Every structure is written in structure tokens, then in C-alpha cells.
Amino acid sequence: MKTHLLVSIPCGRYYRRWLAFIGLLVAVAVQQVGAQPTDSRTEDVTFTSAGITLAGTMLIPRHPVAAVVLVHGSGQEKRMLGMAARLAGRGLAVLTYDKRGVGESGGVYAGPEVGTNNVDAANLDLLAADASAATNALAAHLPARQGPIGLLGFSQAGWVIPLAAIKNPTVGFMVLFSGPVVTAREQLRFQFFTNGNRRFWETHTEAEAREHLRHDPDRYQFADTDARSLLATLAIPGLWLFGGQDIQAPVRLSMEHLDTLKAQGKPYQYQLFPALGHDTASAQSNEPVEAAIRWIEAMPRLKKRK
């Protein structure tokens, strides 16, 4: 249904003021139109990885400045269309897909959410293969002379993304929201110690958390993965966005490990948002996502891998 705006045109000495008012409205409307997200095309796609078919959606601006594949955290996650639309609106080409065994993607989801199968090295490697295949699928749909292609992910992607970048030389950068830079075993020990207590840091110290992280018994037996050893083999730029109140990933230890890698010449950066928790990419604050976008926008158009 169309909405019609009825306007009464004044006469006499108010006519010029009315024209000025209309002119102001037109100027505001033009400004708002200019602020709309970059025109982009949306396409549902499928691609194969490790013998199964994954389903996703691409959002590709007319002139993308760079491109990213969105990589899930843990859980039965479908494609992340809200985040994809936000990034595409800033000129980034995006591919987001349903995790294997979820939504329209084939395969089997490895559960439980926190347990042996989910964090086992074999499953993380399989998820990394999916992210690598998604990178190739996105690259095949991009126009010529596009900017670099990277991986942008959340939480568990702290292990998946470095694994995928090692597999695929097309990956030119990585952005990680609350991605742990520790072993999967250390992360689980920390998460079990905090036990979901949102006020954990009001009653516990970093030293106490480190002690439990080092010595608490493991509840599960699985093949471990160390983010540090993976990152030590890469030379592509990376950005981590951490929340100071995180009770799922040991943030300060992760930052210390990144500082060590940076001292070794790795092109890694991180930002800490003291008031935020683990979900640094949520609508609770726009700052981490905006920081990530600005970092990508500032990246050289062609980034060589060493």
C-alpha cells in the first residue's frame, strides 16, 4: 500500500519559509540516500568440502574493497546474514554459510557443544577445511582486481581460522572476535573454572585463574590444538578483538601470547574492550565490529604472503 503525504502550501509572507523548509527536507533525504549501504548483489550458493555440500549466501558489492568469509564459533550455527549485511554495507564482499550438519549444509555436526568431539583436533581441522573451501568459492565469484580475501570469525574460530589459513594461501588476513590464543585444553579448563559466572572477575584474580588453568584436571580426553603453534607458522596480518570481562576465553593470557608472537615479527594486533564479555561481535557494542572494519579498510590492497 502506498502512503501519500498531504501538504498544504502556505501563502503570503510564509511562502519563502515554506520553500526553505522543503529544501531542507530534500537535502536531508539526499544525504540519507547517500548513506545507504553500498549496492550489492546477493546470491545463494553451494560448494563442496571433504565430500559434502555446504550451503551459504554471498553478498558482493559492485566494487568490493576486500572480501571475508565468516567462520563460526562453536555450536550449531547457521549462516550469519546480519553480520554479512553489515560488512557488505561497508564495501566488503562476504560469504556466510551454514556449518556442516546444520541448516541446509550436509554432513554431521560434531557435538556436544563442549566436549570431546567438538574440540578434538580432527573436528577443528575439518571445520578449517570447510572455511578453506568457502574461501575458494568466494574468490571464484569476485570481480577482477578485488582486494585481499580474509577470514573473520568468532570464539572457536581462534583455532579454525589459523588452520584454514595454513591450508589455503589465498587467505590474506584474519580477524578474530574473542578467539583464544591458547590450547583447546587450556580454554576448557578456564571455562569450567569460571562456570558461567558473569561476576567472576569481581571475586577472582588473574593469578588464581592462571593457577586453575595450569593444574585443573581435564574432564575430557581429546587430541589438543595449540593456537600459538599455528600462528607461529603464519605471516599474514591478524587482528583480535577481546572483551575484558570474558569468562569463556583467557583473554589476558591470549594477549601475552600475542605479544610474544609480535616480538618475533608476526604482524598481529589486538584490541581490548574492558567492559565487554565474550560476545564482542554482538549488538551490545558497535565498537569491536567498527574497529575490525576500519582495520580491514586500512589494509594494503594487495597483501603478499611470506
What kind of region is each of these model predictions?
Residues Q36-P61:
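N-terminal cap/lid segment of alpha/beta-hydrolase-fold proteins
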Residues V65-G73:
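Short beta-strand element of the alpha/beta-hydrolase
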Residues M83, I236, P250-T260:
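Short alpha-helix in the alpha/beta-hydrolase fold that links the catalytic acid
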Residues A88-G111:
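Conserved alpha/beta-hydrolase
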Residues N117-H141:
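Alpha/beta-hydrolase active-site loop
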Residues K167-E211:
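Hydrolase active-site cap/lid region
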Residues L234, W240-F242, D246:
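Short beta-strand/loop motif that positions the catalytic acidic residue
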Residues L276-K306:
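Catalytic active-site module of serine/aspartate enzymes centered on a nucleophile-bearing elbow/loop
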